[in-house]
Amino acid sequence: DDDTVIVHPSERGRIKQMLLKIGWPAEDLAGYVDGESHPIELRQDGWELRDYQQLAADSFWAGGSGVVVLPCGAGKTIVGAAAMAKAGATTLILVTNTVAGRQWKRELIARTSLTEEEIGEYSGAKKEIRPVTIATYQVMTTKRQGIYPHLEVFDSRDWGLIIYDEVHL
């Protein structure tokens, strides 16, 4: 039809930026793929999401994506776990270092139905790809002879959710 414009998926971001520059904000309704199913339940043994954590998880999910900004100690990891449970899919979590990655793993084991065997570590020390994989930014961005050998992790599974931890805007 004459009113339809087809845009190559790789150009979506650039077109949205150009429209914004001329004062036309664009709402991208292209949607997301569901990813590989992997059921995750939040445990409810002696704790529950705080109201603001539930609101953050619901808002993230309603928009299909987003950025969760909370102060230190407010439970961003728990909000991430709630988003994972809502997605019910394989998840890649990118963290700043292995200490943060192991904290994620401890919290996920304590607060969700995930077992140790379902959570992999992809770092300088280990290269485990599992239904939930926690990778460090450092290993993902390692470049050897002009090639990023570890970026294949992004394509190794049909990730239903990717969480970027400690992203500073």
Range-by-range predicted roles:
Residues 1-35:
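Extended alpha-helical interface modules used as scaffolds for assembling large macromolecular complexes
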Residues 98-125:
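Conserved helix-turn-beta segment of the N-terminal RecA-like "Helicase ATP-binding" lobe
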Residues 123-133:
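Conserved motor-coupling elements within RecA-like helicase/translocase cores
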